[in-house]
Amino acid sequence: MAGRTMQAARCPTDELSLSNCAVVNEKDFQSGQHVMVRTSPNHKYIFTLRTHPSVVPGCIAFSLPQRKWAGLSIGQDIEVALYSFDKAKQCIGTMTIEIDFLQKKNIDSNPYDTDKMAAEFIQQFNNQAFSVGQQLVFSFNDKLFGLLVKDIEAMDPSILKGEPASGKRQKIEVGLVVGNSQVAFEKAENSSLNLIGKAKTKENRQSIINPDWNFEKMGIGGLDKEFSDIFRRAFASRVFPPEIVEQMGCKHVKGILLYGPPGCGKTLLARQIGKMLNAREPKVVNGPEILNKYVGESEANIRKLFADAEEEQRRLGANSGLHIIIFDEIDAICKQRGSMAGSTGVHDTVVNQLLSKIDGVEQLNNILVIGMTNRPDLIDEALLRPGRLEVKMEIGLPDEKGRLQILHIHTARMRGHQLLSADVDIKELAVETKNFSGAELEGLVRAAQSTAMNRHIKASTKVEVDMEKAESLQVTRGDFLASLENDIKPAFGTNQEDYASYIMNGIIKWGDPVTRVLDDGELLVQQTKNSDRTPLVSVLLEGPPHSGKTALAAKIAEESNFPFIKICSPDKMIGFSETAKCQAMKKIFDDAYKSQLSCVVVDDIERLLDYVPIGPRFSNLVLQALLVLLKKAPPQGRKLLIIGTTSRKDVLQEMEMLNAFSTTIHVPNIATGEQLLEALELLGNFKDKERTTIAQQVKGKKVWIGIKKLLMLIEMSLQMDPEYRVRKFLALMREEGASPLDFD
């Protein structure tokens, strides 16, 4: 049918303006027909028609969105012709529609189910014409939405013929909505509309992970496992498209607690997590900064941290970006409630405020709180439950592989500029630096650099750099080894000075009893290293005073080559209260649990217990603490050897402490003249002739003297003139009650 000229008019009713139809008088066209409206030779628009008596014959009425789309003005003359669809090619298979609230004042954050929307759309607009770029108004759940047709695909012609689908889909500009057309809704850019359900397009999401990051660039070494665990627990759900997460009913992890010894990379890891993510810059807060002298200000500071996240969630709902808040030293503000002295309860209300913000009545799903501490025991337990800081990750001392990575990172610049000597073997350094934290390894590299630089400084009246030699500056293996020996000692390692004083005179193997003690000690060391069934091995060396128990314990510890050796000795706790003693002992054991292999020597147990026979008196608090620590197994994957020493086995028996040790080894005194002569020969203080004289007096006789006391007597007698030495030594032996020696 040839076209006719008609005049554009305003849509007569609001109801008709929601129908997406052009409205005519029934004298002109019939309801349900389709027309092509031509506004110029190159601009054609297809509309479906409805009739209404209030429209003047010769006029065609359009709604405001239709007039906008077709560029029509009221009263404009346009050419209108009937249009018929080719059902084989122009039935809509799928149509993508951009959706947003029609009026900004009606915005809300309620979720809208796209499946229900699609069903309503097909019902309202069945058998209607749609074109790419068309604008229309859609009413759903008493809300008005503005729609824009983005893309149309024709239905597979095979389906229309009742045959199996051929999989061919063709893009078309104009199509007809039929009962089995599919509609996919796409949220308009910057819209706060919250769409749920399957009938929505997959949004072009920016990955939250930065594409160009790697561990070495981040300066993190030795934390691969920890990082992958954090990623699995905290970020895996955020990488997936929101619609899949929504279908699973999955909630994102909101909090991570990183804990472990100082200098192992907690702060570094948290800082780099922020860089790894394509999120906004994280807010980094030092725990004590939150506190304020004014009432209520501390709580307000917590609220300010979460204000941006709350505002964005209110505006964008599920599509809000990720907000990261990092609390360094979180134990400063999140101590156990009720543990702080004073009547103000400021700390308690700060904890309460933080608890309610992370997971309170109004839940935020767009935050990630990272807390760091080396005292996780101080933190309120309500903060550690799932839904709050639920991922608890220990950032412990790096193993050999981790130390290798860390040293690689800290020497990378030197290697790049050829300042690292060829004789430096990073693998060797990684083996030698047992129980070094990341910060201590960085300190080692710094110390080696300063040693190398020091070689090129002229030692004169002025401090000058020898520029000729400075050009050839190289950090050598010797620099690293010197720094390892003199400058950097690991906090959780073995300080040789601790036990060197106990074995400064060496171990005098005066007989089988000493050899047996050392052999048994070696067996226990091997058991600790190799046995999976006994991660905790404890041994008590008991014997009379001055028999060398502490020296033997220190020797067994030294020979073990464990990376962590500590001596818990009463001489370091002089004047301590009972509570302070318990805390000092607990700290030594807690530090030991952080190392893969540890040895703790508990020296002179009866002195630790404040035992005196008069009364008798002892500290029950220290006794109970020690009993618990002796029996407590180390964490999984860690092994601990405890060596105790005592001169009062009978007292420990009464206190029921002997049962706390796996085994007991007796360390005897020198008991025979032959053993005494063997000890004198090994010490080498007396000449052969002098020893022969002593032998005549002691051979075949019983003696009873500790090796420590023997050393003291020998040193005293050596202060005499040579001819009186032997006489003095034998006299001292007799005075000590070592034996009833008869001599002239």
Curated annotation (Swiss-Prot):
Modification sites for N6-acetyllysine: K105
Taxonomic superkingdom: Eukaryota
GO molecular function annotation: ATP binding; ATP hydrolysis activity; ATP-dependent protein disaggregase activity; ionotropic glutamate receptor binding; metal ion binding; PDZ domain binding; protein kinase binding; protein-containing complex binding
Catalytic function, reaction form: ATP + H2O = ADP + phosphate + H(+)
Single GO BP term: SNARE complex disassembly
PROSITE patterns linked to this entry: AAA (PS00674)
GO CC terms, sorted: cytosol; Golgi apparatus; myelin sheath; plasma membrane
Residue numbers carrying Phosphotyrosine: Y259
Cofactor(s) it depends on: Mg(2+)
Cofactor annotation comment: Binds 1 Mg(2+) ion per subunit.
Location of this chain's protein in the cell: Cytoplasm
Pfam family, one: CDC48_2
EC number: 3.6.4.6
Binding site for Mg(2+): T550
UniProt binding sites for ATP: N505, G506, I507, I508, K509, W510, P545, H546, S547, G548, K549, T550, A551, L552
Entry PTM: Phosphorylation at Ser-569 interferes with homohexamerization.
Function as written in the Swiss-Prot or TrEMBL entry: Required for vesicle-mediated transport. Catalyzes the fusion of transport vesicles within the Golgi cisternae. Is also required for transport from the endoplasmic reticulum to the Golgi stack. Seems to function as a fusion protein required for the delivery of cargo proteins to all compartments of the Golgi stack GRIA2 leads to influence GRIA2 membrane cycling.
Family: Belongs to the AAA ATPase family.
Protein name: Vesicle-fusing ATPase
Organism this protein belongs to: Mus musculus
Source lineage: Eukaryota, Metazoa, Chordata, Craniata, Vertebrata
